[in-house]
Amino acid sequence: IWWRYTSTLDWFDPVSLACGLLLLAAETYAWLVLLLGYWQTAWPLHRPPAQLPADPAQWPSVDLMIPTYNEDLAIVKGTVYAAMGLDWPADKLTIWLLDDGGRAAFRDFAEEAGIRYVARSTHEHAKAGNINHALKMATGELVAIFDCDHLPTRSFLQMTVGWFYRDPRLGVVQTPHHFFSADPFEHNLQRFRKMPNEGALFYGLVQDGNDMWDASFFCGSCAVIKRTALDEIGGIAVETVTEDAHTSLRLHRLGYTSAYILSLIHISEP
């Protein structure tokens, strides 16, 4: 970058100089972002799970929400069955199937599985609106959110909820997304599970580095959010298409903290 500053600008041609300065400004910005990225991830926190109270009667109630719109029932069933298998007191876990597609087959499946089914007559604000609509009926102390193609492991809640006892100002616990099938690039290049993908960088290092600075954020799925904190910010943010990051910013703005637990406690489709 020093060479660019000292040896590449044409000071005698105004047009070339203007174009060169604009390009140099962009390169300087990229260089600063790179340095900040290295600093941000230099000390990943590697936060361990926190222990729950010994008596399960003291554990909080959880609403686990699975939003869906046009996905096949065969995909959604796997997520529901995995949620039903969570190691958590049955009287403290309510599973919600949030069907923005309003499909009879989904309603029948939810009834057979013994879980709650919610459908909206309107579909404003997409996934965020779907979740906010269900929150009006939910009463749990915590809200766990899973995309309909994400499967929690049996220990998911026991691995995440303990941090809400350790940190009273904790607003959200996020976990990484691990994928059991290849994305299009990995499939076409035949690199699946032979080399890390961009998700491994983000969920394996960037988020863990963010956690060191209390800056990890909600990624839309595979997370647990404190209900009182969610109510305080008016529910899931609906003003942007990145409602997960926007929701995180609102939580942090009100003084809530976030946590990131780098453990394989669910798997996902790409």
Regions found by a protein language model. Give the residues of each.
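N-terminal membrane-anchoring/stem segments of glycan-assembly enzymes
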Residues: I1-Q58
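Long helical/loop segments within the catalytic core of UDP-sugar-dependent glycosyltransferases
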Residues: Q40, V118-L142, T153-V241, R250-R253
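Cell-envelope/extracellular polymer assembly enzymes that use nucleotide-activated donors
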Residues: S61-D63, T94, H246
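Short, acidic, metal-binding catalytic loop of nucleotide-sugar glycosyltransferases
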Residues: Y81-K92
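The conserved acidic donor/metal-binding loop of glycosyltransferases
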Residues: D147-L151
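Residue-level detector of conserved catalytic or cofactor/ligand-binding positions
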Residues: L262-P270
